[in-house]
Amino acid sequence: MGVPLPIRMTVLRLDDGDLLLHSPIRHDDRLRRALERLGRIRHLVAPNSAHWMFLPDWQQHCPDALTWAAPGLRERRPVKKASLRVDHDLGAAPPAAGTEEIEQAIVPGGFGFAEVAFFHRASRTLVLTDLVLNLEPAKLPPLARPLARLTGTTAPDGRAPVYLRWVIGRKREQASRAAARLVAWNPERVIFAHGRWFERDAAGALRRSLAWLLPG
């Protein structure tokens, strides 16, 4: 959108006690130590082509963590230039391979875009990245508020920004099937990278946010 946005990292604690960091934010020693008190940081996830830039620092401080990246991310020129190590490409199998605690779906788009969505079964939490923006105007720069409202990305009825809807529309049929799967999971909460997450009536809010993409 061309303006600074509030950003969120989501942390999942897996059945074995290890932590999965989804879309890691800027590394901070205090934050890392707080997380390490909760469990071993084992998985670092870059869920789409826009959410990877802080990963090199996390890799440096968590050398034993595995890095998982959205399909095609490792081939992008900025990623290669940054020397980001990608251990695994996200595909049909989730990072917690061999377990049934996480399901995932790939929402594809044109120009090499793909966003990988995660559903944590135990907490019934759907973790997205940019597929929904639900920005709170009070937390945006004053000049950015009209633009956010114009693009339909403000709370409580946020959705994907216009440019991303256009990109995803390039593979609408496949993306529509993936969106239907997200809704079918019937999540109790939906967390995403930007804005107020869906804490109540999450399934209904998700359906409204994805109405532009859902079949029919």
PLM regions and their residue ranges:
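Residues at the C-termini of beta-strands that transition into short coil/loop
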Residues: 71, 108, 154
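Cap/insert and terminal regions of metallo-dependent hydrolase folds
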Residues: 25-26, 43, 54-57, 61, ...
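Active-site HxH/HxHxD metal-binding segment of metal-dependent hydrolases
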Residues: 33-98
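Catalytic core of the metallo-beta-lactamase
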Residues: 1-26, 30, 82-150, 177-184
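Short, surface-exposed connector motifs at secondary-structure boundaries
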Residues: 15-18, 36-42, 187-188
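Residue-level detector of flexible, active-site-proximal loop/helix-junction positions
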Residues: 74, 111, 197
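Short active-site segment of divalent metal-dependent hydrolases/proteases
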Residues: 51, 133, 197
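Active-site neighborhood of phospho(di)ester-bond hydrolases with catalytic His/Asp-centered motifs
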Residues: 21-23, 42-49, 68-70, 127-130, ...
